[in-house]
């Protein structure tokens, strides 16, 4: 039998339907792969007993002809999603051994459709990071290495565990979240496909909040088709999330293979950065050529406020984070470090519970929201955000169907190589992705090539609100032209 872990989700679904193998066999193959890949540190909690029980239930349903769209498919869940009776920590000490008594909407929809949970995946603490180095469980290793080197690289962040596990064939797909690039950047670093849907497309209920007006859940998968299948189950209106949008969920998979002839693809001139590596330039130009060869029309567009996106993002996101994280005080749940007074209890708990990056962002957020600086920083950043959104609206009003950009300014870097003394160096990783969150638009990262050291590089497509289907159609064109990339196993 083929190694079951090498199948795509779509192929596994066919195999299960034709009874070529069972969900239990598929699940066991992935559990074995997880055991062998512990060096990657992708999973922070493995749930083998639960996985096997869910697989048996899926097999019974398949046998009765009652299979859901994801029946028997083993998935990994980012540790930001609340999972009933399974520890959920956001990879922070402050949540300790918190075990939710409820299930997030996104994961409950995956279980409704028959998926199997393999365990919880590592991420940057409270999703704050671009390299998966801020987790209290330690950094995640990227399955990819530079040719001829033994240096362990980062998988990107904050959804580094999700991207690493999918790239290393430990799960058939994974949930992830994206606040400023946390799905698309790790996908680009690991040669996986990651889509950040339109804000409001997937419910945020039961997901640990970082920046509520920017956070959005989405899948990381092995192919555009797999990502489309997963997004259909994850998306949908949820009355429990006031920002969830009541728009019917289309069959995203039907968009795979759809003609892109006549589509207008915008190439934004502001994304041509000074000192951009020639490899990234070439990748971008290759992507444009592939879309043109498929019948799309390329047009240069202008997004004039792009250069203000990163500074505005690093005001808005920490401001919302400082408000959201105020609930972690050691009183009701999670870590509790006692003190002589309530103030001391808060101080001691937060000092011990929050890692340095989270503390930094909470302090930035508290500063920009303080009385003397609120107008100068926070209000101005929100005005910039409106201008960024307007740039995209103007572009789409001219008939542009999607915008093509690089996903990241470089390939993956080594653990500990960036951001030590200067956090801004790490923040610059999100330069191509934050605009999409600021405008609430959908964006997909698709593997498109390799750099001179054999590391994967990705391209990003940005779409109109709630037009993820076009992104899947265009993404699949790039995927077919570039081919599939798999890492050489070292773990």
Swiss-Prot record:
Q: Name one GO molecular function term.
A: ATP binding
Top-level taxon of origin = Bacteria
Q: Per its UniProt entry, what is the enzyme's top EC class, as one word?
A: ligase
Q: Which UniProt keywords apply?
A: ATP-binding, Ligase, Nucleotide-binding, Protein biosynthesis
List the active site.
78, 158, 182
List the GO terms this entry assigns under cellular component, sorted alphabetically. glutamyl-tRNA(Gln) amidotransferase complex
What is a single Pfam family found in this protein's UniProt entry? Amidase
Q: Please list every transmembrane segment annotated in the UniProt record, as residue ranges.
A: none
* Enzyme Commission number(s) of this protein: 6.3.5.7
* Catalytic function, reaction form: L-glutamyl-tRNA(Gln) + L-glutamine + ATP + H2O = L-glutaminyl-tRNA(Gln) + L-glutamate + ADP + phosphate + H(+)
Q: Which residues form the signal peptide?
A: none
Function according to Swiss-Prot or TrEMBL: Allows the formation of correctly charged Gln-tRNA(Gln) through the transamidation of misacylated Glu-tRNA(Gln) in organisms which lack glutaminyl-tRNA synthetase. The reaction takes place in the presence of glutamine and ATP through an activated gamma-phospho-Glu-tRNA(Gln).
Kindly give the NCBIfam families that the UniProt entry links to this protein: gatA
How does the record describe its quaternary structure?
Heterotrimer of A, B and C subunits.
Q: Member of which family?
A: Belongs to the amidase family. GatA subfamily.
Q: What is this protein called?
A: Glutamyl-tRNA(Gln) amidotransferase subunit A
User: What gene name does this entry carry?
Assistant: gatA
